[in-house]
Amino acid sequence: MEKTLGLHILADLYGVDFEKIDHVEDVKALLEGAVKYANLSKLSSHFHQFNPHGATGVILLEESHISIHTWPEHGYAAIDVYTCGGKEKTFKAMEYIIKTLKPKRIDEKIAERGVVPVNPEGVNIEKMQLAQV
């Protein structure tokens, strides 16, 4: 039996309205809205405005991170949402971003991170193996 420690969604959003992803203030509000909507826990954040267009930003979460990098001149945004614990929060954060940006096309990759064995008896396998060596 195995369990997954985290879920990572990488999304390429195409056909996004220029104005929604050009200014750092809007990009920051987008990610902070996703964090709130998904009930995630923000630790810190950093955002940057590019000249002449585009923005980038990351929010460090207790659960991991959420980030964006934009090319408004191409109507493109690269989104990264990775959380540990409940998968539903990862999907909820991405849902908020997609509903807000309304892209014409989405290319999404989903990866389960940290697939580890589960020992239902609660026995520490590592200690047992060390004792046998």
Swiss-Prot record:
The keyword Kinase does not apply. Keywords: Autocatalytic cleavage, Decarboxylase, Lyase, Polyamine biosynthesis, Pyruvate, S-adenosyl-L-methionine, Schiff base, Spermidine biosynthesis, Zymogen. GO terms for molecular function: adenosylmethionine decarboxylase activity. It catalyses: S-adenosyl-L-methionine + H(+) = S-adenosyl 3-(methylsulfanyl)propylamine + CO2. The active site is at residues 64, 69, 84. Its EC number is 4.1.1.50. Binds 1 pyruvoyl group covalently per subunit. The modification Pyruvic acid (Ser) is found at residue 64. Is synthesized initially as an inactive proenzyme. Formation of the active enzyme involves a self-maturation process in which the active site pyruvoyl group is generated from an internal serine residue via an autocatalytic post-translational modification. Two non-identical subunits are generated from the proenzyme in this reaction, and the pyruvate is formed at the N-terminus of the alpha chain, which is derived from the carboxyl end of the proenzyme. The record marks 63-64 as: Cleavage (non-hydrolytic). Belongs to the prokaryotic AdoMetDC family. Type 1 subfamily. Heterotetramer of two alpha and two beta chains arranged as a dimer of alpha/beta heterodimers. Catalyzes the decarboxylation of S-adenosylmethionine to S-adenosylmethioninamine (dcAdoMet), the propylamine donor required for the synthesis of the polyamines spermine and spermidine from the diamine putrescine. PANTHER family: S-ADENOSYLMETHIONINE DECARBOXYLASE PROENZYME. This is S-adenosylmethionine decarboxylase proenzyme. It comes from Sulfurihydrogenibium sp. (strain YO3AOP1).
